[in-house]
Amino acid sequence: MLFRSVFVAPNCCFTTAEHPVDPEQRKKGLEIAKPIRIGNNVWIGAGSTILAGVTIGDDSVIGAGSVVTRSIPAGVVAVGVPCRVMRKITEEDKTRYPYFEGYLETESTGKGQV
């Protein structure tokens, strides 16, 4: 389930299927599906894999090439294999790209500038 303003870069994989680790259960063809939930304003970097049963919280960023095996909380940057939280997104992050300031200030008027 994807919510609003989710950015998914190229070559990402979302897999909801799981199979048993036990070989006898696998021989019987047993398989289950678990949902994936991606919150609002999430950015998923290129080549990331999101596994079954995972929830990614609102406003989080998943770094390129990550394999998300467990749920990620809201408002964080998470990266790696397996994906782990590196840090919270801070107020400083809002000023990291000053060339967006003119656009963000006028966005509510519908006359944004880049």
Where are these regions (language model features)?
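Outer-envelope exported proteins of Gram-negative bacteria
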Residues: S5-N11, D59, G63-G65, G75
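Glycine-centered loop/turn positions within well-structured domains
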Residues: A74-V76, R84
